[in-house]
Amino acid sequence: MENNEIRFKDIRAYRVGWLLTICDFLIAFPILWAWEKRTTKGVKLDYLGDRKQIEADIKHGAFFMTNHRDIVMDSAWLSKLLRCRYFIRPFIGIGNNLFAYKWIEVLVRFNRCFVVKRGAGAHAQLENAKQLSAYIRHLREQGKSIWLAQREGRAKDSNDLTQTSVLHMLTLDGDDFFENVKMLNICPVSITYEFDPCDYLKAAEMQLKRDNPRWRKTKKDDVHSMHTGIRGEKGHVVYRLTPSINHELDAMLAQHPEYREVPLHDQMDQVCAIIDRHIHRGYEMYERGTDFDAYIESRLALIDIPNKDEAFLREKLYEMYNNPVINYKKAYE
């Protein structure tokens, strides 16, 4: 039997009373462990800086904000790692654009997830954002932990930058922006895959959008990306926890109290820069041997699109693996 196969009689062997949610089930049952063994060389939880400080920061709940590499596995493995080490089971934010089929929506709602509604008109979008902001504040006031990516959708080029729109959405419920941010207790997390199984799909999407700015992914495309991300080879995978940004915010505001009076967009830029610096410093740096060029060519060969521009696609594939290195170096300058 393949590692990732599940037999019904094995499922029945579990006492249902132990399984509070599907998230508990996925962690208790060895499906995530099987995916890890089959598609990686290990999934590791690590720390940037003082581990005791980080553990103190997350003790009473935290807002885990990460870069975004994979639609499914980013949050799935983080949940497993936090659950196994700290008995933390974060609520997970997921965009409704991924509900390609009804079964996905049902699974998501059972899996301690909340929905980030996208694609509505301007007025509806604002109302949805206000409701979500109030819900997140409620969760944090209850001491619950939360996961959300730093941006809407994956960074196709791996240039991981926090979107101010995400930060704005999170802080609509409340009056003082900086105090709203501190209430969230944002603990950035860096996710680094040695190899991105969706790299060739992302490169193809970039050319398709270049050739036709109105091009959009279909539901079938999203499901294919989810499937590829789950089953594709990833090499070594590292999740690196970093300290709460509240420490830097307190120091910054003590030194520059005038920042409380600057326009909101400038305040958001300041906070985004802190989050980005944490994530960039937390990257795992992998050595790329002489066979990396051959790897890129093998990924290029998988791309099957009209008017395939190999030079452009090759450049984008290299860019995906170069940008984290560039940002890592800049973060330490």
Predicted regions and their residues:
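Non-catalytic C-terminal accessory region of glycerolipid acyltransferases
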Residues: 124-333
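Glycine-/small-residue-rich active-site loops that bind phosphorylated ligands and cofactors
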Residues: 69-71, 99-100, 121-124, 154-155
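Membrane-anchoring hydrophobic helices of lipid-metabolizing enzymes
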Residues: 1-62, 68-79, 83, 105, ...
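Conserved nucleotide-cofactor-binding alpha/beta core module
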Residues: 91-119, 126
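Structural motif
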Residues: 63-65, 93, 115, 147-149
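A short alpha->loop->secondary-structure connector
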Residues: 82-90
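Short helix/loop capping segments that flank catalytic or ligand/cofactor-binding pockets
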Residues: 73-75, 101-104, 157-158, 197
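A short, conserved acidic/glycine-rich loop-to-beta-strand motif
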Residues: 63, 90-94, 184-190
